[in-house]
Amino acid sequence: MKKVEDYVRSIPDFPEKGIIFRDITTVIQSPEGLKLAIDGINEKLKGVDYDVVVGPESRGFIFGVPVAYANGKGFVPVRKKGKLPCETISQDYKLEYGTATIEMHKDAIVPGQKVVIVDDLIATGGTTEAIIKLIEQLGGEVVKIIFLIELEGLKGREKLSGYDVDAVIKYAGK
């Protein structure tokens, strides 16, 4: 029986020498791979009390929406600056070279809501750290953070200490 990691395509030396790029397009192109990915995330949510799923553009949408749907929850998108039509709050975060900004609608999280963040991959943790700040600024409580893939060598989990973080697949390297 295949596991979800069997559907992840590993590309050596991309985008640079010494890096193994973990490509999830092969997971979502396969009905079996996609089902295993969503089922794996849902398995990590068993027993978690939450109200809403939050996911960042764009791959957080791919995994977050079906998880929200399967569990009878709503989904809140986090987008790049300037992509949401109503009043937003924003948070800057660091990239390898420079900064980026993400936004969420100001009315997306109700104070006291219990939130699960779902995304495809954690590397350095910077994007997720910014998402947490947005949620908490609106009065939400992050009760679980789930990734399909964790690149343990990049130590992103350390930025998220104090939160319940899990991953379906863990790779030791970068």
Report each predicted region and the residues it spans:
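Conserved G/P- and acidic residue-centered "switch" motifs that form tight phosphate/ATP-binding loops
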Residues: 120, 125
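Short, glycine/charge-rich flexible loops or terminal/linker lids adjacent to PRPP-binding catalytic cores
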Residues: 76-116
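PRPP-dependent phosphoribosyltransferase catalytic core
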Residues: 6, 129-174
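Charged, well-structured alpha/beta interaction segments
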Residues: 50-66
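Active-site-facing substrate-recognition patch
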Residues: 1-52, 100
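Short Gly/Thr/Asp-enriched flexible loops that form oxyanion-binding sites at enzyme active sites
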Residues: 62-71, 132
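Conserved acidic residues
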Residues: 51, 113, 143
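Short, hinge-like loop/turn segments at secondary-structure boundaries
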Residues: 71-72, 92-96, 161-164
